[in-house]
Amino acid sequence: MRSGVIAQKVGMTRIFTDAGEHVPVTVLKVESCQVVAHRTLDKNGYVAVQLGAGRRKPKNVTRAERGHFAVAQVEPKHKLAEFRVPEEALIPVGAEITADHFVVGQYVDVTGTTIGKGFAGGMKRHNFGGLRATHGVSISHRSIGSTGGRQDPGKTFKNKKMPGHMGDVTVTTQNLKVVMTDVERGLIAVEGAVPGHAGGWITVRDAVKKKLPAEAPKPGAFKLNGSEAAPAAEAVNEEGA
């Protein structure tokens, strides 16, 4: 299991394959996605890598956050996320993950926050059919109708589908195929739609239900600030010391 990445949704477009097939894709941008910290068994009880992406002005970051980023020697980040990984898959702190972390043809799971729709009725929120257009129905054509029984059970059960707030929830879309990667511009194009609005933050990880291609880099594709890349295991030992 490898670490995922934090990306930003650019928008949707389409591309054409060599065979002339039209493929709708969502473009994700991976920019300044760096390892901020490690989570170890000794200190935290689990193993994970914490990533940060996006740039923030130091004046807009709390003192505690500035200290956290200073320890990792990275600039303040806009978005933080953790990815559970085994110890051998840890990436050194300060390393920047690049777009070729994923290879063309592999499948990924994408997590984002859906677009908020505000208060919505039953027909829009749950695809209810509504009431009849005529035959005694007036005004309440889009009503949801009855919500329960009579004296027995004498109540409306919990989780009954009703009008209410729609959208603005965390959703994971599984098994999206990577169609293209552009390392220079930090772009990843995946087939299909991705939850959220343009500019929203997205986490991308290897698909759980699909096999990881053999050519996928392990523990990942990244570049270090220094001239030499230290093994991930050594980075864990240094942080745990």
UniProtKB/Swiss-Prot annotation:
Record note on modification: Methylated by PrmB.
- Superkingdom, natural source: Bacteria
Q: Any keyword Aminoacyl-tRNA synthetase?
A: no
Q: Which residues carry this modification: N5-methylglutamine?
A: 151
Q: Which UniProt keywords apply?
A: Methylation, Ribonucleoprotein, Ribosomal protein, RNA-binding, rRNA-binding
GO cellular component terms, semicolon-separated: cytosolic large ribosomal subunit
- InterPro entries per record: Ribosomal_uL3, Ribosomal_uL3_bac/org-type, Ribosomal_uL3_CS, Transl_B-barrel_sf
**Gene3D superfamilies according to UniProt:** 3.30.160.810, Translation factors (2.40.30.10)
Q: Name one GO molecular function term.
A: rRNA binding
Annotated region described as Disordered, given as residue ranges: 140-168, 216-241
Q: How does it assemble?
A: Part of the 50S ribosomal subunit. Forms a cluster with proteins L14 and L19.
Q: Which family does it belong to?
A: Belongs to the universal ribosomal protein uL3 family.
Q: What is this protein called?
A: Large ribosomal subunit protein uL3
Native source species: Xanthobacter autotrophicus (strain ATCC BAA-1158 / Py2)
Q: What is the lineage of its organism?
A: Bacteria, Pseudomonadati, Pseudomonadota, Alphaproteobacteria, Hyphomicrobiales
